[in-house]
Amino acid sequence: RVNTLRLWSAKATNSFDLRVFNSGDYEEAVRAQTFAENISKVLYPEDSTPQGKELRLQQQYFFVAASLKDFIRHTMPKGFDVRELPERIIFQLNDTHPVIAVPEMMRILVDEYDLEWDEAWGITKQCFAYTCHTLLPEALEVWPVSLLERLLPRHMEIIYRINEDFLAELRETYPGDELRVRRMSIIADHPERSVRMAHLATVASVKVNGVAALHSELLKDKVLNDFSELWPERFTNVTNGVTPRRFIRQSNPELTKLITDTIGKGWVANLDRLEELTAYADDPEFRERFRAVKAANKVRISEVLEQRNGIVLPKDHLLDVMVKRLHEYKRQSLKLLHIVTLYDRLISGEVDPASLTPRTVVFGAKAAPGYHMAKETIFLINRVASVVNNDPRVAGKLFVAFPPNYNVTLAEKIIPAADLSEQISLAGKEASGTGNMKFALNGALTIGTDDGANVEIRELVGDDNFFLFGMTEPEVAELQARGYHPGEFYEGNPSLKRAIDLIASGHFTEGNRDAVSAVIGDLLYNDRFLALADYASYLEAQERVEA
C-alpha cells in the first residue's frame, strides 16, 4: 500500500427519535441527525457569524479526531506501545486548520493511555510538523477561548497547561522580557482572550516550514520571528510542488508526447531532465510541433467553454490567463485595470489596433462566501467582459471570459492552452503559489512579481521567459512605512486615471455608478495591496509581452 486517503462524514448515533416524533415534535425528532450531518456537509463553512465559527471548529475537531483515532487504532499493530509513535509517524499540520490535533493527541495519551503529562508532551512534540501556507495575519487562525471552553473544555485545559509550561520556559530563557513573553504566548489577551493556533503549532512541532524560499525567510523574519530566534534549527523551507502526472501527462498528452519523442522516457518522474530540451530551443521542427500543440490545446479549451458555458473564444489570440482564488492580495483588480486601459486606448484611438497583439483574457476564480469585496470584483469583471465583448470597436482585438465554477477539471483544459500566466500578487504576500508552476510546466510565459515561488521559477526559466514587474518586498515595506496614498498614483498617471474614471462613470454598468462604488472607493482610498502603485510597472511589462 502506497498511501491511504480517509474521507470522513458525520453521522448521528441516534438519527431518529420515534417517541419524540409521535409526540408531534417532528423537528426535534431529527435534530441530532441534522446537527451531525451539518458537521461534514460543507468543507470550510462560512465563518463570518458566531454559528459559522462554531460549526467550523466542530468540523476541524471532527476530522482531526477521526484521523488520529483511525491511525492509532487501525493502522498501528495490535499491542504496540504508544511510546513508539515518534518512530513510526509524523502528522503534517497543513496550515492552522488541523492544529487542534495537538491537544487531541495529548488527550489521547494522557486520558486514554494514562501517560504522565511530561512523557505525553515529549511524545506529542515529536509527532507533528507544521507547514505555514500564508503571510496574511488574518489567515492564521485564532479561536476565542470562550468558544473552546464551551465546545472542547478538556482541550482548552490542555492548551492552558501547554502554554503555562511554555511561558515558564520563555521566562527562564528571556528573564525580565515580559513583552516578548506576551508576544509569543499561545493565548492572546487582546482584543479578546483567544488561542493563536500558529503559535500552538510552532511550539508543538519538530519542524516548521514555509512553502517557497522567499516565504520561508519572511516567515522567520516577520510572521514567527520570535520563535525562529528561539528555535532557529526548527525552521526550514520546503517549496510547494505540483504533480506532473496530472498537470502535464494527463492534462496535456500532446505536449507529453512531444517531450518524450524529443528526450525519451522517464522525465515525468525526474523533471530535472526537462533541461535537456534547451538543446532544441532553436530547432525548427521542435518549435513547429510545440506551436501545433499549443494551437490544438486552444481549440480544445474553446470547444469546452462553448459547450460548458456558451462562451465562444476568438481564434488566433494570445491567451492571457489568470486563474486562482479571488483575493485582494492576488490583485485581480490590477488585471482588470489593464483590460480597461487596453479597451480605453482602442476606443479612443490612442493606439493603432494593428499595433496590438489580439488578446483573450480568461479569468477563473471563486470567492469565499462572506468575502464582500471579492464578490464585488467578480461582478465588475463580468460587467467589463460583457461590454468589451459586445463593442464592435474592439472586436478581434480584445475579449474577456470568466467561466463560472472554476475547478481542477477546467484547469486541466485551460492551463495547457495558455500563452501568458498572470502571477501578479503584491510582493511579500503570496506564500508560494502552485498555479505558476502548472503554467510554466505547460510552456506558458509568466508575467509576475518577485513573490512566492515566482522567484524560483524565474531563476530556472531565465529572465527572457519571465516578465518581471512591480516593487520588491523591501520596497513594499518602505512605501507602507512612509505612508501609502493611492490617490497620488491615481492623479499622477493619466492612463490609470482614465481607466478608473471610465469604470466609475458607470460605462460598464449601464450608467449605474453605485454598482461599482465599493471597488472604486477601495482602490482610491484604501488599496491595501498597492495595485495602483504597481500599475505603471505592470503596464510596462505588458508592453514587453506585446513586443
Description of each model-found segment:
Residues 1-547:
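A conserved ligand/cofactor-binding region detector
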